[in-house]
Amino acid sequence: MVLSRLAASGLLLLALLALSVDGKPVQQWAQGGWPRPGPEIPPLKVQQWAQGGWPRPGPEIPPLTVQQWAQNWPHPQIPPLTVQQWAQWGRPPGPPIPPLTVQQWAQARPPHPPIPPAPLQKWAPVQKWAPLLQPHESPASGTTALREELSLGPEAASGVPSAGAEVGRSGSKAPAAPHRLSKSKGAAATSAASRPMRDLRPDGKQARQNWGRMVHHDHHAAVGGGGGGGGGGARRLKGLAKKGAAKGCFGLKVDRIGTMSGLGC
C-alpha cells in the first residue's frame, strides 16, 4: 500500500513539472538565450556551398596561386599555367586566355601573314624525274667497241691467233673459228646491248680450251722454242695423263680451272 502511494505521488509530480515548463527550453535555445553545447552549426545553404553540392552564390574564389599572381605587381607578362587554367575553366566571364604554347609561339615569331584555309592551300608540284635507262641500253657508243672486243676474246683483240689454238691434245692442228664483225657500229651496239656476253661468243669448245691455255700459260708452257713449243706442250700433257691425272683437265683439277678462268672443260 505504501509503495503504491509513493509511485502515484511521483507520477503526479512529474506531470506537474511538465505542465509548468511546456516548451520554454526549446524557445530559449532558438532565441540564443540558452548556451548551445558544442560548436555552432552553420545553416544548410552554407554547408552545401562548402561541400560543393549547391551552386555557390557569388563569384568563385580563385586559388591561392591566382590571388598571389594578381596581387604581385609588377608580374611577368605571361601568367603561370595555374592562373591560365583557372581563367579558362574557373570563371567563364571575360575573354579566354590562350594556352601557354600559343602565347610563346606568338611572342617568339615575327609578324607573319595569315595562314590560308586548308581548301585554298595547294600541293607542291610533283617533280618529274628523267626516264630511266633500259637494263641493256648503252648510254654511249664508246662502250660498244669494248663489248665487242671482250666478246670476241683475246685473239680478236690482239689480232694474232695464239699458238695453242693450232694444236690440240694430240698435237694436230685445228682450224680456228672465224670471227665475223658486224658491218656497222649501230647494229653491233644494238646486238651487244640486247644479248648477254655469253651469247656473243661465236667460238666453240675448242676455242674455249685455247682461251684456258692462254690464261694458264705457265702450266702449258713448252720446253722447246719456236715451232716445237706446241708439240712439247702436247707431250707434257700426255705424260701427265699417264701418271694418273686423267681425271683432271689438261693436267689440272677441274675445280681450279673453273675458279680461275670461269670456263671449265
Swiss-Prot record:
A cellular component annotation (GO) from this entry: cytosol
Major subcellular location class: secreted
Keyword Protease listed: no
Pfam families: ANP
Subcellular location, record wording: Secreted; Cytoplasm, Cytosol
Matching InterPro entries: Natr_peptide, Natr_peptide_CS
Mutagenesis or variant effect for P74A: Low decrease in ability to enhance AsS activity
Mutation effect (P80A): Important decrease in ability to enhance AsS activity
Keywords: Cleavage on pair of basic residues, Cytoplasm, Disulfide bond, G-protein coupled receptor impairing toxin, Hypotensive agent, Metalloenzyme inhibitor, Metalloprotease inhibitor, Protease inhibitor, Pyrrolidone carboxylic acid, Secreted, Signal, Toxin, Vasoactive, Vasodilator
Molecular function per GO: hormone activity; peptidyl-dipeptidase inhibitor activity; toxin activity
Region (Disordered): 153-211
Biased composition (Low complexity): 184-194
Miscellaneous information on this protein: The name evasin stands for 'Endogenous VASopeptidase INhibitors' and is given to endogenous brain proteins in order to distinguish them from venom proteins. A BPP-13a without the two first amino acids has been detected.
UniProt-recorded name of the protein: Bradykinin-potentiating and C-type natriuretic peptides
